[in-house]
Amino acid sequence: MTYIFLQHYWWFIVSLLGALLVFLMFVQGANSMVFSLGHSDEERRVVVNSTGRKWEITFTTLVTFGGAFFASFPLFYSTSFGGAYWLWMIILFSFVLQAVSYEFQNKLGNILGTRTFQWMLVANGIIGPLLLGGAVATFFNGSNFVVDKGNLTSFQPVISHWANASYGLDALLDPWNLVFGLAVFFLARILGTLYIINNVDDENIRSRGSVRLVGCTITFLIFFLAFLVRTLLKEGFAVDPSTGLIVMEPMKYLHNLIAMWPLLIVFAVGVVLLLYGVGRTIVSKTYIKGIWPAGIGVVLAVLALMLCAGWNNTAFYPSNADLQSSLTIANSCSSEFTLRTMFYVSLLVPFVVAYIAYVWYAMDKKKLTKEEVSDEEAY
């Protein structure tokens, strides 16, 4: 195993975790529609308990995603999470609201009322996907930071800092970051609807979900296709492999997909699976398993996009303030010893995934009903 192989391997692992996180945000997507899917207190409690079975998996994946970045690409972690901390703090705060809501909305002594905590779930369902999508869009559009490794020898060894006082909120001023954020938001709603249709045994909730699935899909396609076409045709942040200098290359991301044609196939298969899962669910009233082809499709498509952003001599975290401060998998990664050690540890990941799959299967063997949420231990 060479150092270059380990760099690419760990970008693949980080990309896979990011792709899984996007899929698991069906929790946020469903929670954003608590009041539109459930018209009565009982129906809303069914929706909340359905997502309540999975919210910890989503949150754990988010933390693991950040942890993998910290361990494998620490300069990115310190630059983004340390520099753009207002953006990340808002995201994390919305997930804290989610955890608090699940824990206390139906507890005795709740002076705020159940609806207040349910609105917290709605807030997380909107803010989480929107801002996470905007943050990921900066991988293609750039952020405003400066890296100066010469500061390693100074009294205060801070080698990266944000170039303005917004500390990450300036990402929301780029309309294309918002376009992708909205695409992720509506994708989360699509997945959330498909999950509820599959997980909840209630015809009223399922029929409302089918209606909202059409609108969310159309809106998602508008935002996603606009971002995709613009990204493939715009200049990208390329790395000169001989000098390490960052240069602008016309249609860089399109060239990446052509050069790494297996990724193009993976992306296309992912899109087809997503559309199949959505389309069949809309057309057939008896088909309730659309979450699985759609979910697999989302993981494949997002994985391909993330790999396109970091492989093939591409700067995965470009700097708009100083082009040469842009981060690549080569200049931001951990030492070869660290990456190699973590490689062996990562071989245990399939066993963890298998355990999660088993627990998921055990929880979902029986569809959720109104009778089940009357239990005292329900959310």
Model-flagged regions — what are they?
Residues 245-251, 318-339:
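Short, membrane-exposed interhelical loops at transmembrane-helix boundaries
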Residues 8-22, 82-95, 122, 126, ...:
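Alpha-helical transmembrane segments
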Residues 365-379:
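Short, highly charged, low-complexity non-transmembrane loops/tails of multi-pass membrane proteins
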Residues 295-325:
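A C-terminal functional module that forms or caps the active site or interfaces directly
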Residues 1-59, 63-66:
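N-terminal signal-anchor module of multipass membrane proteins
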Residues 24-32, 60-108, 124-151, 184-188, ...:
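Transmembrane-helix bundle segments that line or gate the permeation/cavity pathway
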Residues 108-288, 308:
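Long, contiguous internal "core" modules enriched in hydrophobic/ aromatic residues
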Residues 43-53, 79-88, 111-125:
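Membrane-interfacial loop-to-helix junctions in multi-pass inner-membrane proteins
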